[in-house]
Amino acid sequence: MKHTPSVWPNMVQLWRKEWGLGELPFYFAEIAPYAYGGTQQEKAAYLREAQFRAQSLIPNSAMISTNDLVEPYEIYNIHPRNKTKVGQRLSYLALNLTYGLKQIHCFGPQYKSWTAKGSEAWVSFDHLEMGICRNYDLRGFEVAGEDRVFHPADKVWLHWQTNEVVISSEKVPNPVAVRYCFRDFQVGTMIGGNELPTIPFRTDNW
């Protein structure tokens, strides 16, 4: 799935054709964190990326993130216990996008762009109408330099005036790429003010 997000629209197109329901809304959940081959592996991260990209290829579709709905002890639990919030988040998509209840927020922060400022990476996001929740430490960020080796950020802070996240690592004096929760198992802690999580992302294409 690393390079084949088109698999998803082909599947949905077939289902819609078989059911004869036109562009029936297709809302789905991002696969949850799980240590398929160890915590530092990235295979599942590429699948999540393909899921996210599939939204732009499938008309009338949307995805929820689940990367904050697992506990550290669930590292080898492929079906995490917290099912209620998964259902709630899917219902938010339906209520907002299908039934037009726009007062119900259905999207968490999504990566928009980033800029290098010296040794710091300044990252901006879409869907920040309610800002970023400051009740959590911002963990899960990594930064890489020209050697393409990613290091955990040792300093992450929120520039609240612009809602940008500023990331740096002492091991990376000149950042060229940023990743967030781009591992098989990494629990997300960056939550929007609407209590919805940030979609895992990477800025590189290596």
Spans of model-derived segments:
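Catalytic cores of secreted or luminal carbohydrate-active enzymes
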Residues: 47-140
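Hydrophobic, well-ordered secondary-structure elements that form the walls
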Residues: 15, 90, 178
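Composition- and surface-driven signal marking solvent-exposed, interaction-prone regions
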Residues: 1-6, 41, 137, 191-195
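Short, contiguous acidic/charged loop-to-helix segments that flank catalytic cores in large enzymes
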Residues: 2-3, 77, 81, 153-157
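Flexible loop/turn segments at secondary-structure boundaries
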Residues: 33-38, 70-74, 130-132, 186-188
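C-terminal beta-sandwich/jelly-roll accessory domains of carbohydrate-active enzymes
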Residues: 122, 128-206
